[in-house]
Amino acid sequence: MKIFSKIIIGFLFLSFILSSCNNTTTYAEQLKAEKELIADYIKRNNIKVVTEEPKVWDENVYLLTESGLYFHLINVGDSAAPAEVLDTNDLVVPRFYQYTLNAKADTISNWNTVDYPYPTTFNYLDDSQACAAWHEAVSYMKYNNSRAKFIVKSKIGFEDASTAVTPYIYDMKIKFQK
């Protein structure tokens, strides 16, 4: 009986030791990898990062905001109609591509949702309907038919990106309804 007890205790001890050793990465390591991936993407694409909003958006100039959003305005949109400026709770209808930042980018979403019976929409500044990064990007876009590219860190992205600590780049064009 003593031998049997020793075998059981030994087995329990061994299983405890083996279960405490795992090869998963820590959250801090995932954040570091995310930061490195973004830095590598910026370098590979010759992106110039600025901290003040440029008056003229040159090619490959991205604004780094306090939240960590990298934003580049491609097209101002319909700025000739000042009455058509985006306002709180306006319904935003985005068309967007979502890519990974890997050297060989994967297209995660390739949506032209405007043509869908139920397009992707959200109310501007209603945080329950879109991620913080989308609201911030749209705040810089302001006008119908505005187009921008932006890099979204996991912390300000959608929940699935946050859980996986995965940054994405979006190429987005917006329309909105008052």
Predicted regions mapped to residue ranges:
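Start-of-domain signal
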Residues: N22-D90
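C-terminal motif of bacterial Sec signal peptides marking the signal peptidase cleavage site
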Residues: I17-S20
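Bacterial N-terminal signal peptides that target proteins for export
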Residues: M1-I9
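A short beta-strand signature
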Residues: T88-A103
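Alpha-helical transmembrane segments
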Residues: F11-S15
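A beta-strand/beta-hairpin structural motif
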Residues: K32, I74-G77, L101-K178
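Short acidic-hydrophobic surface loop/beta-edge motif
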Residues: I8, Y62-E66, A148-F150
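A generic structural micro-feature
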Residues: L86-L91, A164-Y168
